[in-house]
């Protein structure tokens, strides 16, 4: 987790700072597909002050299988399924435009639904888009991302 946390710090400090300077804006949009959607989602919810929009494509958010039963605070605070239900201030996410994209052939579809249920339970505004004829692969994501960007 130390390497992951260092990676996240580079993204939030260096990449986000560069994006804000280049675009002359306060918040940045983050997106990713599959495990990349996990990273984008985790960064967005851990740093809501820096993120204006989140687009998750076929997100895979359950990281527990990577640790074979090991669990500590680093894992807890990097697992949206764990820390989001316990957040005392869900209002801090409502400025973000949040899109969770999935489809009927997406093998991680249940994960987007689970995240949506958590967000609903906390009153966090978002759009769960469950499209027909969509799966968990690049050919679907190539169509989904431009569509979602057009909705921002």
Task: Tell what function each PLM region has.
Residues 1-152:
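Non-catalytic cap/lid and distal C-terminal segments of serine-dependent acyl enzymes
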């Amino acid at each position: 987790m130390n390497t992951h946390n260092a990676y996240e710090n580079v993204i939030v400090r260096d990449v986000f700072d560069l994006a804000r300077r280049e675009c002359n804006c306060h918040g940045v949009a983050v997106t990713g597909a599959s495990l990349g959607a996990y990273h984008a989602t985790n960064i967005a919810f851990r740093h809501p002050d820096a993120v204006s929009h989140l687009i998750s494509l076929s997100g895979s958010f359950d990281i527990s299988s990577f640790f074979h039963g090991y669990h500590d605070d680093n894992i807890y605070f990097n697992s949206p399924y764990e820390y989001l239900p316990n957040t005392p201030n869900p209002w801090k996410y409502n400025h973000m435009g949040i899109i969770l994209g999935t489809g009927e052939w997406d093998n991680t579809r249940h994960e987007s639904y689970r995240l949506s249920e958590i967000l609903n339970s906390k009153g966090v505004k978002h759009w769960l888009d469950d499209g027909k004829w969509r799966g968990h692969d690049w050919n679907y994501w190539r169509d989904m991302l431009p569509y979602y960007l057009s909705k921002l």
